[in-house]
Swiss-Prot record:
Disulfide bonds: none annotated. It comes from Bos taurus. The chain crosses the membrane at residues 20-40, 77-97, 166-186, 207-227. The gene is GJA5. One gap junction consists of a cluster of closely packed pairs of transmembrane channels, the connexons, through which materials of low MW diffuse from one cell to a neighboring cell. A connexon is composed of a hexamer of connexins. It is found in: Cell membrane; Cell junction, Gap junction. This is Gap junction alpha-5 protein. The keyword Membrane applies. GO terms for biological process: atrial cardiac muscle cell to AV node cell communication by electrical coupling; cell-cell signaling; heart development. Keywords: Cell junction, Cell membrane, Gap junction, Membrane, Phosphoprotein, Transmembrane, Transmembrane helix. The modification Phosphoserine is found at S354, S358.
Amino acid sequence: MGDWSFLGEFLEEVHKHSTVIGKVWLTVLFIFRMLVLGTAAESSWGDEQADFLCDTMQPGCENVCYDQAFPISHIRYWVLQVIFVSTPSLVYLGHAVHMVRVQEKRKLLREAERAKEARAAGSYEYPVAEKTELSCWEEVNGRIALQGSLLNTYVCSILIRTTMEVAFIVGQYLLYGVFLDTLHVCRRSPCPHPVNCYVSRPTEKNVFIVFMLAVAGLSLFLSLAELYHLGWKKIRQRYVKSQPGVGECQLPGPSAGRVQSCTPPPDFNQCLENGPGGKFFSPFSNKMASQQNTDNLSTEQVRSQEQIQREGFIHIRYAQKPEVPNEGSPGPSLPHGYQSDKRRLSKASSKARSDDLSV
């Protein structure tokens, strides 16, 4: 047996991006397969061919009978089983690492673009709530919820390893059956007659065979349970999304069926609206303020012009000669800007009084 540390490091990374059932499956793979194969099982099959004895002296007959009894050694067969079963998980790990790096690069690019725009604008941008993109997983309470392409890869890896598990269980049954026989009768050439061959430590080997078959069955059950868990979770999410009114805030009362709108207080005259790209912006932008200032300025100019015209008209009327009420000669002209007394004289005061001032 070689060193399993290289494969173990990879599977530890897979453990971080797996579901609860997937973590149990990896624990079974580590403890009940790799650890057993690396310690106890290898020692039981170490002297397999050396202690395989046959009651014949025919050259080559013993080797032929051993090949018939064990087409492939159990220990090597189980090593192949572990490699083929864990390969889909390694492929999934490669995809997960790739997606992590891609999302980190996208995040760095977004931050660089935002900093560049801030420097170009010359103003500080307050941190705003951005619209989150659909990622391949979500960390909720320290757990990773798979979704998107990463979820599809994970499901495919489970399907492949389930198929591999079934194939190796069926293959082991077809090659060896369930138990090893103590006596093996060989009838192959060049043996001249049926030869009796004896397997070393058959009971110990049968214990390991049954144990490995049970672990393979447990691994298969966990894979099927994980598929069921993911499928049921996906169906439940689609069912919840298909329900009308899910996610709407409804208040108890007669208007419970209506969606309550957010109404600002009376003195709240500037509402922040959600703009494109998930950023918050004010509806009273600089462009609207500039247009309003221009309109106000034009209105003030029109008013000032009207007032100037009105004042000029009054000065012109006052500068004209006053009309003489009788047919006498016109009196002396009034100086410019002089405003005569236009108070109406009564009939009783038509005669000249001694106290009247002469002009």
